[in-house]
């Protein structure tokens, strides 16, 4: 058949998530849900790095703390490592003042989780300052820029510049998956419009390097009509999943849903087309074979990410009576079987 290969390592991670439905994610103690962690382990060589990025003052640190409380700390066997990880959790607070001052790995050393069959997986989240927004404070000292030392220069640089560089490095160099945390403006004193430029900058960085990502819309009222409307607008704007949640009240099923949606943002690695054997004997310029080839090209042209598989129109052409999507194999490298009759 015809195939479309993907080369980037990011295109092969977390693909196995979709194998299980969202419904089984509610009780992490079940064997199938430990299998979920095992699948992640297989896809990432045992190390999962989630880059929590976005504008400043959106709740990134709050998201990290809740994620660790729900998904990591309860499954750490070593008491001392667990306590050390708790001590390393980021601070968060209400208001306009920037709390995070530099990129930070949470935990400092990746937390190792033991699964039922002695499989082990390392998980680490990466916090960052974020891109600056109008109205935030903490980046100035009086009327001058706050100067800070960074690992990247041998001299002080302005806080805003350091925050931008650090955030870009998290996106480009450290994270395997991006979670963009933004807000509808309900979580603090800054209005929604103040976050838009920094939000767009974050998404642009992720799009440029092709890393899979989703957007978390932090809100004190995630189910309100206004928040849902904003989420739908962002979905249309960025062409990616946007999930309204309250980061302070993040639940386990929220986390699983976020990870599940990330899966749909991974590129399709390969497509296989199956046609009747006898058509393979036809010359390439035969009208029937030419139409089949053109149909394959059309489908491939609209198939970039996993989510595109389910949005694709497999309407048959003149010579093809039926086209059937037979299999979406997400257990290895995410490929699709499409059979024409």
What does each model-identified segment do?
Residues 7-25:
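Short, Lys/Arg-enriched N-terminal segments with co-localized hydrophobic residues
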Residues 220-277:
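Canonical P-loop GTPase G-domain recognition
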Residues 70, 131-132, 205, 209, ...:
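Conserved, well-folded catalytic cores of nucleic-acid-processing
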Residues 31-143:
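Conserved G1/Walker A P-loop phosphate-binding module
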Residues 28, 44, 48-50, 57, ...:
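P-loop NTP-binding site
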Residues 139-157:
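A solvent-exposed, charged loop/short amphipathic helix patch at secondary-structure junctions
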Residues 1-13, 337-341:
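Single conserved hydrophobic/aromatic residue that forms the stacking wall/gate
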Residues 155-237:
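Conserved C-terminal guanine-recognition region of P-loop GTPase G domains, centered on the G4
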